[in-house]
């Protein structure tokens, strides 16, 4: 019923605009476009002042996401998914499906869990009592994850509110990032207005390492998903024991060199890949992922379903250690989806390839 009403409303709006615009001289169209774009922008800003609950349905898996008011990034992502036709980051979901089926006893950790999309999805997919770990630096997002889990009737997500790094230090958690504002200011990597927001609204806390977080746990993850907006260098180099001894799969968004310079100073993309290879992983670039403009939502439902059903296969490019810099050289316009797999596991054992 919802889709029928939406289609009918779309037709009414289209024909109404057609009737209104037809008599107007074409030279005025550019001004009309500017006005409409501003109208859409203001509408989005107003909508962000409200909390929304977004129903997610990925094949036979259903869950809910709690999107708090004024969470601009969550509103940007999830308002695109309200009609239920598309899913977020389909390539990662498809790859994750194959891994969860392939691993004998999967234990999942969502590093940079945001509002709980992957944590809720994996919990529903596995449907057992082992914990799903959701690691998040932002206090408010941690509360959002708990609300998403509660709305989805999920009880096995363990939310870990922590700032991760490669060593013990004091950093600020602000929005989706963790940073040292003094270092950013010294290197002039962000503007002064942004720094003022960080200092005013950010939370200053001591960091820990992922090795230390899971040293205290009886059940250790063997699958990691990581989206930490440029902090992946510092976090991974503080996770060497976990990666070496326990993790079989790492699904990671490798961010741009600019993001790494801000949030993982001293680490390059090549450092990260070579570090993983030294820890007995094979690293692969997976496509499709982004269209180059950070658009991480499938262009159409048919394409999305073909990957979910494995009738279309993901493509991979293995990164050889001595060619790492060359392979990554011209891939800096958007985030890259990296799948790192322990060397004894053949990537072709995953049915998404």
Model-identified regions with their sequence ranges:
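Core alpha/beta nucleotide-donor-binding catalytic domains of modification enzymes
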Residues: 146-147, 151-180
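S-adenosyl-L-methionine
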Residues: 2-154, 196-200, 217, 285-353
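Short internal loop-to-helix segment that lines adenine-nucleotide cofactor pockets
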Residues: 78-109, 158, 167-172, 181, ...
